[in-house]
UniProtKB/Swiss-Prot annotation:
This is Chaperonin GroEL. It is an enzyme of class 5 (isomerase). It comes from the Archaea. Belongs to the chaperonin (HSP60) family. InterPro entries: Chaperonin_Cpn60_CS (IPR018370), Cpn60/GroEL (IPR001844), Cpn60/GroEL/TCP-1 (IPR002423), GroEL-like_apical_dom_sf (IPR027409), GROEL-like_equatorial_sf (IPR027413), TCP-1-like_intermed_sf (IPR027410). One of its GO terms (molecular function) is ATP binding. Keywords: ATP-binding, Chaperone, Cytoplasm, Isomerase, Nucleotide-binding. NCBIfam families: GroEL, PRK00013.1, PRK12849.1, PRK12850.1, PRK12851.1. Its EC number is 5.6.1.7.
């Protein structure tokens, strides 16, 4: 085991604070509509961004003790990103304010454990106040405003996101891809799409576009591997008599079965395309069942004691059209019963409500969306690769913030809801040392508003005084227009979940850091300084 450096008490906390400040001071200049950009020097070329978590993740400090502080503040941004996908800069600003004030008080002799308790109590009260002011999202215009603000006031992005949600529904899947043109566009994929293409280019029906397109096809759905021609003959004879095309979704189609299919296609005897089943393991079984219900077919599986030789026409699914390229399959207008599809959706929704794992949630959301309203794809276009990357980040931020607003509602933005939450702490009672923690949170709740004003070229203290003079809960400073007004009416909105999560994550990390008495890092005899540290 390598030698270690140890640092204790005040020295340790101040080293951590240095690291926190270096990250937070870099990130907080991006806050608000007039926040600045930061250029990141990356291997693929420089990236210009104002996304807090992206900036924070890039920072590594030379001093190992300071770097521990940097990692802790980065954790605030990462946790907020994981929870809501936005609000990372606000969370970082809140954490820095709590840590700075907390260390001042601990240095003066206050008990860090009691301060931590006070901080957590105050944050609980502030969160209750924020939730009480939350307004449910009910219209497209609100979604549009939230998306625009989260995309750094880009109206084009806001309009695309609100249109995408309008098309696929609030639970619909919206993805972001690179555009092959300079334009940023929205594409709506109706029906169900999954990431599996044709197993052989011989199956292509449109050679110029390299796609398979079938109208009114039958669909064979199975989790079995098809290798034997004998297995397929009864199905192919039925299809030939029907005169309709066939899409096969199977674990795989290989050997003489694949050869026979290709020969029949070349001869013009039948129209057929085979694709591998999407997903893996238990998820594959569920997705195949989704496809079967959507198309009115039956999954031919060992579990059901069904063999491919026993398939009848009524076991095959049907759809209006099917399109297959080398990467994906799209089924449009599945002919399953609406009642069966609705029952399936309710089952997935109930599973979504009880599952806690992020991967399982994402999988269930994707399945529900494909059964509900298809998939919307926002294609980010710009003149250079750097601009495309930056635009994709803004679209992702706006998309995540909008989804958060749909989930928990929205509040007045511009830092004013956090600022007004101070009122909820005025009447709090606690032990004297816990009250220090409460006062730390009071001071921290001003900081996002102060920083937004500073970034807009205004004096933070002056802006705070002006807002205090008006009793309205939603009256605040609109940095975009440089005016004081009712921010709800002006459309300056923040998702409740983003505001709440940022505050809770900031308090969690601040409490952890303030109650730290020692820091242990690796020691390199040639590189490391030894001042204020003990080497073991």
């Amino acid at each position: 085991m390598s030698a270690k450096q140890l640092m204790f008490n005040e020295n340790a906390r101040h080293a951590l604070l240095e690291g926190v400040n270096k990250v937070a001071n870099t990130v907080k200049i991006t806050l608000g509509p007039k926040g600045r950009n930061v250029v990141l020097d990356k291997a693929g070329g420089p990236v210009v961004t104002n996304d807090g978590v992206t900036i924070a993740k890039e920072i590594e400090l030379k001093d190992k003790f300071e770097n521990v502080g940097a990692k802790l503040i980065k954790e605030v941004a990462s946790k907020t990103q994981d929870t809501t996908g936005d609000g990372t800069t606000t969370a970082t600003v809140l954490a820095q304010a709590m840590i700075t004030e907390g260390i001042k008080n601990i240095t003066a002799g206050a008990n860090p454990i009691e301060i931590k308790k006070g901080i957590l109590k105050a944050v609980d009260a502030a969160v209750a106040s924020i939730k009480a002011k939350s307004i449910e999202v009910k219209d497209k215009e609100t979604i549009n405003r939230i998306a625009i603000i989260s995309a750094n006031n880009d109206e084009e992005i806001g309009n695309l996101i609100s249109e995408a949600m309008d098309r696929v529904g609030y639970n619909g899947v919206i993805t972001v891809e690179n555009s092959k043109t300079l334009e940023t566009t929205l594409e709506h994929v109706e029906g169900m799409q999954f990431d599996r293409g044709y197993i052989s280019p011989y199956m292509v029906t449109d050679q110029e576009r390299r796609v398979v397109e079938f109208e009114e096809p039958y669909i064979l759905i199975t989790d079995r591997k098809i290798s034997s021609l004998k297995t397929l003959i009864p199905v192919l004879e039925m299809i030939a008599q029907s005169g309709k095309p066939l899409l096969i979704i199977a674990d795989d189609v290989d050997g003489e079965a694949q050869t026979a299919l290709i020969l029949n296609i070349i001869r013009g005897a039948i129209k057929v395309c085979a694709v591998k089943a999407p997903e893996f393991g238990d998820v594959r079984k569920e997705v195949l069942q989704d496809i079967a219900i959507l198309t009115g077919g039956t999954v031919i599986s060992e579990e059901r004691n069904l063999a491919i030789e026993d398939v009848t026409l009524d076991m095959l699914g049907q759809a209006r059209t099917v399109k297959v390229d080398q990467d994906k399959t799209t089924i449009v207008g599945g002919k399953g019963k609406k009642s069966d599809i609705d029952t399936r959706k309710k089952l997935i929704e109930s599973q979504l409500n009880i599952t806690e794992k992020k991967y399982d949630k994402t999988t269930l959301q994707n399945r529900l969306a494909k059964l509900s309203g298809g998939v919307a794809v926002i294609k980010a276009g710009a003149a250079t690769e750097t601009e495309v990357k930056e635009k994709k980040m803004r679209i992702d931020d706006a998309l995540n913030a909008t989804k958060a607003a749909v989930e928990e509602g929205y509040v007045a933005g511009g830092g004013v809801t956090l600022f007004r939450a101070i009122k909820a702490l005025e009447s709090m009672k606690a032990d004297p040392e816990q009250m220090i923690g409460v006062n730390i949170v009071k001071r921290a709740l001003e900081e996002p508003l102060r920083q937004i004003a500073d970034n807009a070229g205004r004096e933070g203290a002056e802006v705070i005084a002006m807002i205090k003079s008006n009793a309205s809960e939603t009256y605040g400073y609109n940095a975009k227009t440089d005016t004081y007004e009712d921010l709800l009416q002006a459309g300056v909105l923040d998702p409740t979940k983003v505001v709440r999560s940022g505050l809770q994550n900031a308090a969690s990390i601040a409490g952890m850091l303030l109650s730290t008495e020692a820091v242990v890092v690796d020691f390199d005899e040639e590189k490391d300084k030894t001042s204020a540290a003990i080497i073991i």
